[in-house]
């Protein structure tokens, strides 16, 4: 069994991700569970009944506490001085933004006890059928973690 998890806010849902998640429903095998965590209410049923919506703040009160604790800390908000601000490395100091991703994964991991738990960024648009055989190649049974490696300094964490 596969569970694909993502998180986003309502603005991102309306701008692009609604179409993207619809493509997941069309191209992933029917037995794949699709879970969307958001801090905003999103009517996913209007897109596809297969998408499961979960309120991120209800599922992860620790995220709310984390954001409150670090709301004024520039190292958690992407403002670490002129040297990094506005550069490609600024993401390293956007802990609050990326915490939504990690807390969504952690929340879902607490309730899933079988199969693969897979993070997929909400900006992914699927254009080709992903068969069960293809997923088995991406996520081999003899491995516990899979991700998209790439040359250079940073790995791709949009699919893990």
Residue ranges and their predicted role:
Residues 31-33, 116:
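Residues at the starts of beta-strands that form the adenosine-phosphate
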Residues 158-160:
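Short glycine- and hydrophobic/aromatic-rich loop-to-beta-strand nucleating segment
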Residues 42-111:
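Active-site-proximal specificity loops/subdomain of glycosyltransferases
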């Amino acid at each position: 069994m596969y569970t694909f998890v993502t998180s986003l806010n309502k603005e991102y849902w309306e701008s692009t991700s609604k179409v993207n998640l619809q493509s997941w429903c069309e191209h992933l095998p029917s037995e794949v569970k699709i879970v969307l965590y958001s801090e905003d209410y999103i009517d996913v049923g209007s897109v596809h009944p297969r998408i499961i919506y979960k309120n991120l703040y209800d599922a992860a009160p620790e995220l709310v506490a984390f954001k409150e604790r670090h709301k004024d800390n520039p190292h958690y908000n992407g403002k670490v001085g002129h040297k990094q601000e506005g550069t490609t490395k600024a993401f390293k100091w956007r802990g609050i933004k990326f915490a939504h991703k990690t807390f969504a994964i952690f929340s879902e991991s607490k309730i899933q006890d079988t199969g693969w738990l897979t993070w997929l960024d909400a900006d992914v648009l699927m254009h080709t059928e992903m068969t069960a055989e293809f997923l088995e190649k991406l996520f081999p049974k003899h491995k516990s973690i899979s991700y998209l490696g790439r040359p250079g300094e940073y790995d791709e964490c949009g699919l893990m």
